Each structure stands twice: as C-alpha cells, then as structure tokens.
C-alpha cells in the first residue's frame, strides 16, 4: 500500500514537471490572442491593456515558429523548416526579464530553464550575453524537422547598428520600438513575404 502511494506521488510529480516544462502544449489563448495568432499579415500589432497577456502571446507564437509545433487551431503563418529569429525589448535587462523569461524561464534560476514557452526538451545550446547578469545572447531550439532554429535576443538601446545585417524569418518586438529599430526589423524580414 505504502509503495503504491509513493509511486502515485512520483507519477504526479513527473506529470507536473512535464506540464511545467512544456507550456506550449497547454496554451489556451483568449479570443483576442487567437485572432492575433491566426492573422496571416506579415506585420501585426497586439495592443491591449497592461498585464493581459501580450508578452505571453508573443512568446508562444515565437515558440511555435521556433519548434514548428503548431496547435490544431492554428491558421496563421507556419514555417515548415527551422527559422532564424530575434526577440527584442527596450533594454538588455527588460529583454531578459520579459522576452527571455517568457521564452526560456526565470533568468536568475537555472532550475527554471524550460519553464517558458519553449519546451525544455527542445532547448539546445544557449549563449550568455556579456555584461548582463543572467541574460542570454542567443539559443538554439530543436525544430520538428530535426534541424535547429536560432533565436537572438536584442535590445533597442543597442542602437540600430546592432539590428543590421542578418536575414531573419521572425522578429518579436515586445514593446513599441523607435522608428529606426522598427525599420531594421522590417528590413531583416523583407524577403519573407
């Protein structure tokens, strides 16, 4: 009897761990989020009040593109191959505290890796950002095709020069950027239709 109870507790803990490290499979967007995700527009804006899930929506969509694991309800754009992407915010710290946290997990807790929108078992190599505690510069994510998607973290404060040069599939701008950064984001994805 005691062994059965201990085994049941172990199973419950493992199920909870799997749920926590695979948020992508459990995401149930509100109607306004689903409408945003299902738009096929090449440029989109999700404007809503504070603390209602805008950043979560951006992170979940980015995770779908990075992994190629789109839900059944998805009608938006799909990538059938690994992608190159950037996620950006106002500063290195806010990019870490919002974008990185929503995608990977709490930045200052190594045990939280994989508790963001990207499932733990699909996170590959991560590269730290120099000079910014607990911040990532980039990471790779296993795509369902077997290849690796690449995600870089950028900050508007870096200036437009740091946003130049790369050809990308997806750019997630978590807060309204300066016009020069927005222009660079458009240029990076210009040939992606």
Located regions from the model:
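Phosphate/NTP-binding elements of NTP-utilizing enzymes
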Residues: 1-193
């Amino acid at each position: 009897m005691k062994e059965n109870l201990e085994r049941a507790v172990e199973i419950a803990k493992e199920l909870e761990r799997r749920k926590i490290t695979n948020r992508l499979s459990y995401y149930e967007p509100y109607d306004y989020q689903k409408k945003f995700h299902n738009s096929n527009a090449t440029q989109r804006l999700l404007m809503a009040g504070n603390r209602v899930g805008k950043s979560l929506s951006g992170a979940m969509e980015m995770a779908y593109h990075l992994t190629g694991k789109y839900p059944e309800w998805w009608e938006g754009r799909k990538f059938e191959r690994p992608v190159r992407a950037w996620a950006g915010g106002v500063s290195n710290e806010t990019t870490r505290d919002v974008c990185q946290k929503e995608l990977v997990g709490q930045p200052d807790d190594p045990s939280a890796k994989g508790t963001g929108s990207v499932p733990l078992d699909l996170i590959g190599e991560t590269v730290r950002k120099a000079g910014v505690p607990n911040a990532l510069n980039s990471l790779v994510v296993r795509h369902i095709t077997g290849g690796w998607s690449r995600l870089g973290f950028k900050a508007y404060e870096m200036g437009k020069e740091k946003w130049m040069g790369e050809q990308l599939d997806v750019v997630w701008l978590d807060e309204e950027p300066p016009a020069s950064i927005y222009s660079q984001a458009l240029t990076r994805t210009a040939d992606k239709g």
